[in-house]
């Protein structure tokens, strides 16, 4: 067409207008910008929406009555259920899960818009008029809502500890396994010993540490003090600062501006 071939307008006009608008001319185009750019944009929105949902789903699981390690802020007078006054439903994160589906729904039609007849038909137009604003607005709203949920999130450390303690120390089985290996037992035998005792705790209850203390093989290779050290949670927190630094990337010190050299 006349636009793509520049039959009526010199390419310099396009370059001038684009520069004034803070844009760059499309390097490979016909009458329209190739829709692979649009597809990449909406695919990115879909990934962001999925990340929002990932966090929302985790909060929903943590708010379950039998877990209750964290939950959405619940205002005074707020209703969780019209029929059951005691309920504190995670309505905000449930809403975020739904919004993520809306945003992801734009990805497939965006991909399908890439293949236009002879590089230009208008089949993409009606599709983009619907999902383009819907996906962008929905994700903007979802991000704002998620920020509010995280900022006001209620966290219950005591419940976290209670949940860890509820399995009688089984969460420390890996540390016991490694300690037995270091004490000279083969990995296969150490695994069998630890698993055998762990399964008994699963079936019969009780404390994992006490079960191991009663195991003669364990007693021959580890003292009670060495065994007790395996049930110390402190080693799991040694590198917590490093983990947080990786996640939040502390701001690097601003570089001092270079001095201009004199003539």
Predicted regions and their residues:
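Glycine-rich cofactor/substrate-binding loops
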Residues: 84-263
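Internal glycine-rich alpha/beta core junctions
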Residues: 1-116
């Amino acid at each position: 067409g006349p636009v793509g071939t520049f039959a009526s307008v010199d390419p310099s006009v396009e370059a001038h207008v684009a520069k004034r608008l803070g844009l760059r001319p499309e390097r490979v185009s016909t009458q329209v910008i190739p829709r692979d750019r649009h597809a990449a944009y909406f695919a990115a929105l879909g990934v962001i929406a999925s990340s929002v949902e990932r966090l929302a789903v985790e909060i929903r699981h943590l708010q379950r009555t039998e877990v209750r390690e964290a939950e959405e802020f619940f205002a005074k007078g707020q209703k969780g259920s019209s029929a059951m006054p005691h309920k504190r439903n995670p309505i905000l994160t449930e809403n975020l899960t739904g919004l993520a589906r809306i945003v992801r729904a734009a990805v497939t039609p965006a991909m399908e818009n890439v293949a236009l007849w002879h590089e230009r038909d208008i089949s993409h137009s009606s599709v983009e008029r619907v999902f383009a604003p819907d996906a962008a607005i929905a994700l903007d709203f979802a991000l704002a809502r998620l920020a509010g949920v995280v900022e006001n999130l209620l966290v219950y450390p005591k419940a976290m500890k209670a949940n860890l303690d509820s399995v009688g120390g089984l969460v420390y089985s890996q540390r016991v396994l490694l300690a037995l290996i270091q004490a000279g037992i083969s990995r296969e035998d150490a695994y069998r010993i630890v698993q055998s005792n762990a399964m008994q705790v699963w079936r019969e209850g009780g404390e994992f540490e006490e079960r191991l203390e009663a195991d003669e093989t364990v007693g021959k290779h580890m003292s009670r003090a060495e065994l007790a050290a395996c049930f110390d949670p402190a080693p799991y927190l040694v590198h917590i600062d490093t983990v947080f630094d990786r996640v939040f990337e502390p701001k690097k010190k601003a570089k001092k501006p270079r001095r201009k050299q004199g003539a």
